[in-house]
Amino acid sequence: MINLLKKFFIRLKIIFSSILEPYSNLYWSQEGEDILINRIFANKKNGFYVDVGAHHSSRFSNTYKLYKENYWNGVNIDPSLSSYVDLKKKRKRDININIGISDKSEILKFYSFNEGALNTFSLKKKNQLKLNYKLRKIEKIECKKLSQVLDGCLKKNTKIDLLTIDTEGHDLKVLKSNNWSKYLPDYIIVEISSTTLDKITKDSITKFLNKKHYRIYSKLHKSVIFKLIN
């Protein structure tokens, strides 16, 4: 009886897979960013990304689909030790770095919640999150500028196709820490909390990236994708 049930469920799985697979599209990101990015890059193979606030090898990842399906690789940066251990184990083609990113070299308080995707350096964000999530611990973390980290791990003239940043209220400081005369990603994904396109165009992140020759290309729920305009 048990064997018959096993065979039944196996056949059921095969049937549903054959029905759904031609019309389905797997994604790992929170808002479908990875599907959109894959469309933007037209299924480009062997691209290169930098993922700041990577969090996890696959869960909520903007880069795992590129890594898994299109053989991309890149740099994953996260201040959480548990995130780093997971990334190092499961993203072996990538460079995985356990450090915080800020607009200067400094030691910052890192607020860790029961939902690891919400961990943040931002005191303002921490105060908002603790109303609905449990603050597990506060620890002091070493931070460096993004330019310093990339200088230390990338070969000369490395082309960055995609920079994705998810640092829960700390994104602008990450952007300010880049060397824009040296590292110019084709596309950038950041979180902007403004809800309308009109407000997004007036946001401090948008104004900063506009000065670096980036323009809004697409918007999801919170994530905004910027494109480099040559």
Q: PLM features: residue spans?
A:
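Phosphate/nucleotide-binding beta-alpha loop and adjacent structural elements of enzyme active sites
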Residues: M1-N230
